[in-house]
Amino acid sequence: IGTKYAVGVNSGTDAIKLSLKALNIGPGDEVITAANTFVATVGPICELDATPVFVDCNDTFCMDTNLVEEKITSKTKAFLPVHYTGYMTDMRVMNRLSEKYDIPVIEDACQSILGAIDGKNAGTWGKTGAFSLHPLKNINVWSDGGVIVTDDDELYKTLRLLRNHGF
């Protein structure tokens, strides 16, 4: 897919949750995400006692990046764009905002395994990318599964610990 590391987990939901935990997202934090998504994107945010902040979507049903900046507050600790049906949130804009505000990006690429912008694959633009291998997803296994991808050495180590009941 184009990253240094991939960490297998039991689901796309856990791929998102462990990514959030690895970035120390918790009580009182806000996570900006797409209004058009499945509970598996928002559930992990709430499970960590953080607050989802929703951004409306554009014609591709992905987050409208023109509306993201107005949602940023001092409590914003992560961006969680959702790529949908092969379409991707404009990650060039998301990464510019990430650099400008020092807010990490976790990509929900569970529905866009083969999506790409400028030849760069979905899930490879942010600090982590979360993929689902659920039977109803683009690439699936007989039961369920998930994958977290990253280029960050320390995040990789943390994710491996968290995957095995680490704290």
Regions found by a protein language model. Give the residues of each.
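Conserved residues at the C-terminal ends of beta-strands
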Residues: 9, 34, 82, 132, ...
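Short, conserved catalytic or interaction motifs in soluble domains
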Residues: 11, 57, 84, 135, ...
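PLP-dependent aminotransferase-like
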Residues: 21-109, 116
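Short loop-beta-helix segment that forms the pyridoxal 5′-phosphate
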Residues: 1-19, 33-37, 55-56
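Active-site region of PLP-dependent enzymes
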Residues: 112-118, 125-167
